[in-house]
């Protein structure tokens, strides 16, 4: 297992950080109260120290790969600030063990100012200001201000500012700093003494505030007691008045109870008469119920009869449709099985394929067959047909804003668009029948083929499942 040599500063191996004698450079001797000065100047310096307070500090750690700090310490108010890295933080910093360097920033504030950046240290290997001083982080150079001590797994290193670097160069450090100590230059009033003075002043102020609060509390309690006594006297008078009102109300309630007793006797006799009426109504209801059962049985018989009639009608319709299919037989053409004829008359919409007389006659047969079938099946046509043999017509009652509603079902008319629209309406009536019985439409404009499919469906008896038969249970 390889050992880390001195100077290999990894963030993951950091154990503690210590900031020595934190002072702002521009206010280096702000709290240094000289005992040789006169009493007035020392009093001014003391008031200034009390008003501005001692310096507070916290530390943030940064790495090159992250914009935000990877760790922020708690705030400390000690002159020499030591921040230890515990096991949880060490596990968190373990992910940054491959960083080449890391940055330590100190943030300072007095009691009257917000925190601001105090100093920044870049912890980099072979830095001239970062020196190894041993394995004990407790002993350090006391006279150096704004000094940084970093304790790693392989030892303790000291990082100083440029002002203290000359002093460091004049000093030779032994292998262990446990035997090394230099007395610190001390001012008339040290930071510790000023802190005690500040705390004492705060205690005195708190005592005065507490005194005024206690006095105000006692005065408030006395005032509250007087108000409470006055409220109780008013409450006693109110209770006496309420007692008199309750006595008067009690007398009224006695009179009311007497009246209610009289009313109760009257209500009792009224209920007795209503009971007799109810018994009579009950007997009448039983008679009505017997009549209802008789009517329900009669209705059931009529419903069953109606069902039988509907079934017989459906069979009769089937028989009539069979007769119609014999009167107007729709069969494949002898020469071309892909085409159908009605009574051996062809029906084609291709130009010049059949003459107008044959087409008018076949359309007239089909129109009469369709109108008769709609009457048998009790289904109204969306576009009614005016049967007149080969001069039949069809009505368009649905299309809005048209100059005429009657369209001829024979081709010998001008303009030809009227005849084409009439054929379209006739085909829509046939398709409507197919959709009613759930039959597919193979070729939307092959009228005879679709009509043949409709007749075969009705003659097979499958249309009976579409007959609307209703039954009412008693």
UniProtKB/Swiss-Prot annotation:
One of its GO terms (biological process) is late endosome to vacuole transport. One of its GO terms (cellular component) is phosphatidylinositol 3-kinase complex, class III, type II. Residues 271-300 form a coiled coil. One of its GO terms (molecular function) is SNARE binding. It comes from the Eukaryota. It is found in: Cytoplasm; Golgi apparatus, trans-Golgi network membrane; Endosome membrane. Keywords: Coiled coil, Cytoplasm, Endosome, Golgi apparatus, Membrane, Protein transport, Transport. It is a peripheral membrane protein. Involved in endosome-to-Golgi retrograde transport as part of the vps34 PI3-kinase complex II. Mediates the interaction between atg6 and the pik3-ppk19 core complex, leading to the recruitment of atg6 to the membrane. Component of the vps34 PI3-kinase complex II composed of atg6, pik3, vps15 and vps38. PANTHER family: UV RADIATION RESISTANCE-ASSOCIATED GENE PROTEIN (PTHR15157:SF5). Belongs to the VPS38 family. This is Vacuolar protein sorting-associated protein 38. It comes from Schizosaccharomyces pombe (strain 972 / ATCC 24843). The lineage of its organism: Eukaryota, Fungi, Dikarya, Ascomycota, Taphrinomycotina.
């Amino acid at each position: 297992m390889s050992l880390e040599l001195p100077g290999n500063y990894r963030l993951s191996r950091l154990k503690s950080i210590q900031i020595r004698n934190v002072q702002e450079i521009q206010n280096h001797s702000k709290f240094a109260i000289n005992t040789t000065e006169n009493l007035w100047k020392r009093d001014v310096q003391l008031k200034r120290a009390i008003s501005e307070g001692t310096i507070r500090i916290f530390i943030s750690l940064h790495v090159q790969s992250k914009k935000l700090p990877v760790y922020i310490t708690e705030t400390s108010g000690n002159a020499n600030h030591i921040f230890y890295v515990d096991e949880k933080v060490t596990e968190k910093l373990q992910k940054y063990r491959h960083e080449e360097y890391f940055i330590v920033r100190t943030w300072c504030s007095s009691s009257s100012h917000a925190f601001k950046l105090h100093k920044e240290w870049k912890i980099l290997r072979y830095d001239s200001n970062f020196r190894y001083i041993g394995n004990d982080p407790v002993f350090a150079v006391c006279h150096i201000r704004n000094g940084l001590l970093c304790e790693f797994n392989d030892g303790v290193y000291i990082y100083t500012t440029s002002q203290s670097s000359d002093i460091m160069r004049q000093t030779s450090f032994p292998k262990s700093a446990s035997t090394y100590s230099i007395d610190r230059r001390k001012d008339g009033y040290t930071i510790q003494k000023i802190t005690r003075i500040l705390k004492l002043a705060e205690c005195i102020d708190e005592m005065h505030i507490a005194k005024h609060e206690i006095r105000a509390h006692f005065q408030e309690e006395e005032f509250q007691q007087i108000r409470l006594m006055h409220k109780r006297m008013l409450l006693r008078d109110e209770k006496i008045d309420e007692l008199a009102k309750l006595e008067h109300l009690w007398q009224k309630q006695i009179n009311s109870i007497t009246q209610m007793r009289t009313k109760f006797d009257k209500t009792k006799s009224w209920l007795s008469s209503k009971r007799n009426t109810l018994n009579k109504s009950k007997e009448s209801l039983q008679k009505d119920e017997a009549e209802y059962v008789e009517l329900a049985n009669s209705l059931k018989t009529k419903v069953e009869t109606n069902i039988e009639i509907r079934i017989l009608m459906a069979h009769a319709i089937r028989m009539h449709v069979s007769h119609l299919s014999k009167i107007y037989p729709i069969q494949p053409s002898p020469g071309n099985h892909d085409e159908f004829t009605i009574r051996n008359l062809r029906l084609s919409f291709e130009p010049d394929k059949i003459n107008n007389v044959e087409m008018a006659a076949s359309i007239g047969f089909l129109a009469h067959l369709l109108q008769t079938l709609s009457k048998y099946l009790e289904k109204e046509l969306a576009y009614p047909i005016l049967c007149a043999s080969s001069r039949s017509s069809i009505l368009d009652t649905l299309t809005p804003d048209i100059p005429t509603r009657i369209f001829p079902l024979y081709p010998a008319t001008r303009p030809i668009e009227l005849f084409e629209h009439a054929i379209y309406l006739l085909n829509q009536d046939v398709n409507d029948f197919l959709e009613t019985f759930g039959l597919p439409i193979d070729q939307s404009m092959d009228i005879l083929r679709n009509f043949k499919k409709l007749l075969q469906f009705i003659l097979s008896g499958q249309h009976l499942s579409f007959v609307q038969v209703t039954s009412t249970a008693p």
